[in-house]
Amino acid sequence: MNKIVLAAAVAASVAAFPALAEEDSSVDPLLTIWTRDATDYNAFSKVAERYTKETGIKVKIENQEQSEIKFEKAASRGEGPDIYLWAHDRFGQWANAGLIAPVSPSEEEKAKFFRFSWDALTMQGKTWGYPISVEAISMICNRSIIADKDVPDSLEDFVKLDDELQKKGIHAIEWDYSQPYYSFPVMASQGAYVYKKTATGYDVNDTGVGNQGARTGLKFIVSLIKDKHIVKGTDYGIMQDDFVNGHVACVFDGPWSWSYYEQAKVDFSVNRLPTLNGQRMKAMVGVLGLIINAHSKKKDFAIQFIENYVLTDEGMTEMNDRRSLGAFALKSFQAKSKNDPRVNVTMQNAQDGEPMPSVPQMIKFWSAIQGAITNSTSGRQDVDAALSTAHQRVLN
């Protein structure tokens, strides 16, 4: 889009919101974006450069550690970025707290994206952001250790493979097991669920974190550690180091890791998540979205940047070339990626999985279930006691 067209579009947007026009007249049109990590920072660099070149509006990209915590604190003070990149599961909490602004994309704009991606960002009849991509973990395997045709389809078969590989000093599987995002999919395969899905959203008074399926899944994870199929204390950093150094055959990881493994010269495959007791693991599906700070005085510029620069085939190409985004919310760009098996598998795992509920109560779920997993895998509590406690914490 050239400067004249953008200027006209921005002018129309500002004219539609006189209060914004008045505010923006005294504000330097510098857009600030906060990202989650260095790979997200790199992803935005090219599209931001193009936007500045064509419009004259500068974009400041900041990589913030623990950005979700910093965003909450800054936005609650009326500060922080204009645009923030995060997965949709926290949007309900932030919307409820008045930290993010609802958006009103046109029906024409909405039609460009898969409907479920908008559904994930819609609460209480309002849309709280723009979808970029669909994220789900997959089973990523090192081809120098295990050929594609030999990748087990069940966790039980991974145990058998581990018995063989340990003779060579290699483990069959690892993941950051203390984090619910990676371990709850095992529990969900057996019937655990975060909150009960209803016709209008979620019943936050009905949780399956302590049901029999959750117990079966977590007991299996504990058994993997107890029987030394997974090294006790494995976290995300250890897992990635082991994978790139050839100490483990397969890991649970997401599309954000692909570029890291490519840079490490690992020849890897992306595979469907395995089963447990014949039931497929259910990834916790996130829609990566761009949200606008409720206190931003440059909402009009933010919307123009997002709709006309980021969420286009050109913008998605610029981003995905620098940071693997996984499966795409933009239909036209997903269609262009149909021959990429990694993208297709990610979408398959997303379809097998369950979207993370975007309700304010999710913060209680994350805290409670992480405590249960940590206490169970460390031996501080048995699984039944740990999940009973988690169940009560999620509901109270």
Residue ranges, per PLM feature:
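Long, aromatic- and glycine/proline-rich binding clefts that accommodate carbohydrate-like moieties
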Residues: 271, 319-368
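Glycine-centered hinge/linker elements that transmit conformational signals in sensory
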Residues: 162-165, 203-233
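Extracytoplasmic "Venus flytrap"/periplasmic binding protein-like
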Residues: 49-115, 122, 128, 143-153, ...
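Conserved N-terminal structural module of periplasmic/extracytoplasmic solute-binding proteins
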Residues: 4-9, 18-93, 107, 277, ...
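Periplasmic solute-binding protein
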Residues: 92-99, 116-153, 177-202, 285-292, ...
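Conserved C-terminal helix/tail region of periplasmic/extracytoplasmic solute-binding proteins
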Residues: 23-26, 349-396
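Hinge/lid segment of periplasmic solute-binding proteins
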Residues: 88-137, 153, 157-160, 167, ...
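Extracytoplasmic/periplasmic substrate-recognition and gating elements
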Residues: 49, 53-54, 127, 147, ...
